[in-house]
């Protein structure tokens, strides 16, 4: 999924546009599909200005996280880490996670954020903009993604299925929406 962030006030009104490529999650593959997903994520990491890894601050660092770090170490691209959900954890838990990721030596910068509370998100975006190579704006200023809303809804449903059914459902889940009633937006 491509996410598009446009800030027309950036750089004294010259504006900027960041394009985020949400890759499939890196994980220890159990089959060919899993290996292909990892390969896609790593190939994407090699063709961008900066890699942003967002981790859930409420979860302990585990073997899967170490596997992700090992895979990311194969890319020479600059890397920034965002430890999300700072509003739900205490300073000790944050420091423990921060130190664990910092020990890897992979990250050029590490941020504690709360996407929900909008804590440090501006600082993170400013940091990311420092790694961007100047270029044209590829998308209209009001565009937030290159996918239709129906696709986004199916991806949210798929994500929730995988989240709540955990080991019961393979990663090869496909969601087909048979009926969809698009209503005017209340919020963006």
What label would you give each PLM region?
Residues 77-80, 86-151:
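Canonical P-loop GTPase G-domain recognition
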Residues 26-34:
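Flexible beta-alpha connector loops of hexameric P-loop NTPases
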Residues 5, 9-21, 35-111, 164, ...:
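Conserved C-terminal guanine-recognition region of P-loop GTPase G domains, centered on the G4
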Residues 142-188:
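Long, well-ordered amphipathic alpha-helical subdomains in the mid-to-C-terminal portions
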Residues 1-2, 29:
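Conserved substrate/cofactor phosphate-moiety recognition/catalytic segment
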């Amino acid at each position: 999924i491509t996410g598009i962030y446009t800030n027309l006030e950036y750089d004294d009104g010259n504006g900027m546009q960041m394009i985020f490529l949400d890759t499939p999650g890196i994980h220890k593959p159990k089959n060919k599909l899993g290996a292909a997903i990892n390969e896609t994520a790593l190939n994407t990491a090699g063709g961008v200005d900066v890699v942003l890894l967002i981790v859930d601050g409420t979860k302990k660092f585990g073997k899967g996280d170490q596997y992700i770090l090992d895979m990311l170490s194969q890319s020479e691209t600059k890397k920034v880490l965002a430890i999300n959900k700072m509003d739900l954890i205490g300073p000790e838990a944050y420091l423990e996670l921060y130190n664990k990721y910092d020990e890897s030596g992979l990250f050029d910068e590490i941020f504690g954020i709360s996407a929900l509370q909008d804590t440090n998100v501006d600082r993170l975006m400013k940091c990311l903009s420092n790694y961007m190579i100047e270029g044209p704006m590829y998308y209209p200023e009001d565009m937030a993604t290159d996918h239709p809303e129906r696709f986004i809804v199916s991806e949210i449903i798929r994500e929730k299925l995988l989240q709540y059914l955990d080991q019961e459902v393979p990663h090869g889940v496909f969601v087909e929406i048979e009926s969809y009633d698009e209503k005017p937006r209340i919020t963006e």
